[in-house]
Structure formats: C-alpha cells, structure tokens
Amino acid sequence: MIEVSEDIVLYPLSVDDIFKIFNTLNNEREYMREWLPFVDATKEAEDTENYVRYVLQTADKQFTIYYKDQFVGLIGFKDTDSDNKKTEIGYWLSQYAQGKGIMIQSVAKLIEHAFGELDMNRIQIKVAVGNDKSRRIPEKLGFQM
C-alpha cells in the first residue's frame, strides 16, 4: 500500500480488483474509449481477469487508486527495465473522479516510489496526442515533453 494523502491510497493490483476495474471501464466505456485503446477489446470481466493475471506475472507493478475508499482508477509501471533502471508510468482515472488532483498526486507519489524504493534512474510518461488533461500531469511534474 502507498498512502498518497489522507483521501488517496494506492493498493497493489490483485485478482480481487477484477470486477471493480471491469465495471468502471464498462460503465464509462463511451468516455474512456477515446484515450484507452484496450477498452473496446474489454468486453467481459474475463478480459479484465486475463489482463490482471498477466500483469501479476510481470515485473511491472500496478496499483489500484482509491479516493475516499472508492475505486477510481489504475496507475502503474510499464515496460520496466531493471537492468537499465528505467520504466514508464501509465494511468487512467474514472471520469467522475477527475478534476480533484487525484492523478497528479498519485503520479508524484509513484515517481517518488520509483526513484526511492525501486532505484530507477529514468521514468517516461507517454500521452496520446490530444489528451490535454493527461498531458498536464507530466508537464506540471517537470517532465520534458
């Protein structure tokens, strides 16, 4: 568990999260499909289960984001290269939870975790062209764009 603030907590991804993740994606499918290419391929909870089980077998740590004890999204490392001490951070947040500073605080805390606990030297964040809300996060955190 990584405590981000009094209201925001990151929990390691587990199989117990499958239905929360699927239900959020399914309920917000129209909104999320614009930026998350996997949404249309996620048709059943089994698709989410396959993803979660795959991630749990990799070196890429992923976390659920809880805001005021409610699941609101995912954040985690992707394409981690421990030998060269570099990783990428990816994230998504439920539409209703946006605009509250949840993601920028979560990304900042995950960066701190990557440099401090995981001994990373380089972190990348890739953002879809046109996704200005997502782009503002690495910009505000001082990433080179």
Q: Across the structure, where does each feature detected by a protein language model lie?
A:
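Short loop/turn motifs at secondary-structure junctions and domain boundaries
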Residues: 53-59
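Acyl-donor (CoA/ACP) binding surface of acyl/acetyltransferases
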Residues: 1-20, 24-31, 62-145
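Conserved GNAT-fold acetyl-CoA-binding loop/helix
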Residues: 31-53
